[in-house]
Design a protein with these regions (language model features):
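Juxta-kinase regulatory segment immediately upstream of eukaryotic protein kinase catalytic domains
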Residues: 2-57
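ATP-binding glycine-rich loop module of kinase domains
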Residues: 41-107
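Protein kinase-like catalytic core scaffold
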Residues: 88, 119, 136, 186, ...
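Activation segment
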Residues: 95, 143, 193, 198, ...
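Conserved structural core of kinase catalytic domains
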Residues: 110, 118-167
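Short C-lobe core helix of eukaryotic-like protein kinase catalytic domains
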Residues: 172-179
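Catalytic-loop of the protein kinase fold
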Residues: 179-192, 197
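C-lobe/activation-segment region of protein kinase-like
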Residues: 202-291
């Protein structure tokens, strides 16, 4: 896990100024943190200091995140007086451009008014690391578990059917939601490690870094939706326990992921592109049932 202790709070950035956010990030001195927007405590951000305390226990249920994402308790101080402690996740990016893009995506997802809205972690700030990387700070919500960590818990035995159904349902609900939006997103890395659920088994979006707003009316872009489906199905079907037994069998994947998606293709895509997705799905079902 990355370590960020010793970073101080400086240079507040206004959340509404997202169009100029990239330039402001590049101006942020290395080794400094900037929070987005005004502080809810009613104190100017420039009067605050921050202390980060590593919380390795927050990584439970997020195995594939721990090498890239740091989890912390962030305590805000004013004149050396502690005001509030908040759980944070801090994720590094190679460039400020990708960091800013992800912030914009997270904000857009969380602003959507939808009866089945799936939320993601709210971005709270940016850190400019000493090595030149830019890291995004977001709220951390305990109890969110990635699907791959659920699989890992049963590697030495067998994955119970109800757990396998939960994984397939979570993947379907998440992908279908983002594909069905008026301005849809493709995930572009739809492995089970990037699907998650809350303690109430409600789908939760944990990684938006590769999300792209994609035009389903454009035949040249329709393949991105098909690749999302394909990536997810192969990710599920490739999971095996320590004895080499398949943990999510093809019949379950078809019943709880492919079939419900397939039943709504006519609503998801225009007629001239729906057939492309349907053909892709038929080939996919044949592949996994034959053990390809």
């Amino acid at each position: 896990m990355r370590q960020f202790e010793g970073y101080s709070l400086t240079t507040p950035i206004t959340i509404g100024d997202v169009h100029n956010l990239s330039k402001q990030v590049t101006r942020l001195p290395r080794g400094n943190i900037a929070l987005l927007g005004t502080d809810r405590l009613g104190i100017p951000l420039e009067q605050l200091d921050i202390e980060l305390t590593p919380r390795d226990d927050y990584a439970e249920g997020r195995r594939n995140s721990i090498n890239k994402v740091g989890f912390y308790d962030a305590t805000l101080y004013c004149s050396d007086i502690p005001l509030v402690t908040q759980p944070w996740a801090i994720k590094p990016y190679l460039t400020s451009r990708t960091a800013v893009k992800d912030i914009t995506t997270m904000q857009a997802i969380n602003s959507l008014q939808h009866p089945q809205a799936i939320r993601t972690f709210e971005p709270r700030g940016i850190a400019h690391l000493e090595n030149g990387e830019v890291a995004v700070i977001s709220d951390f919500i305990q109890g969110v578990r990635s699907c791959d960590s659920l699989v890992d818990a049963y590697r030495e035995t067998t994955l119970p059917e109800e757990k396998a159904r939960l994984i397939a349902h979570t993947a379907f609900s998440t992908m279908h939601y983002f594909h069905s939006l008026p301005e849809p997103y493709t995930m572009n890395d739809a492995q089970i490690k990037n699907f998650a659920f809350t303690i109430n088994t409600e789908p939760w979006c944990i990684d938006t870094e590769k999300f792209l707003s994609t035009d389903k009316d454009d035949p040249s872009s329709i393949g991105q939706f098909g690749r999302d489906i394909e990536c997810c199905v192969y990710s599920m079907s490739s999971q095996s326990n320590n004895d080499g037994q398949q943990m999510l069998i093809p019949e379950l994947i078809i019943e709880h992921f492919i079939k419900p998606y397939e039943e709504d293709i006519s609503n998801l895509f225009p007629r001239d592109t729906a057939s492309i997705i349907q053909t892709s799905i038929e080939n996919l079902k044949q592949d996994i049932t034959q053990g390809a």
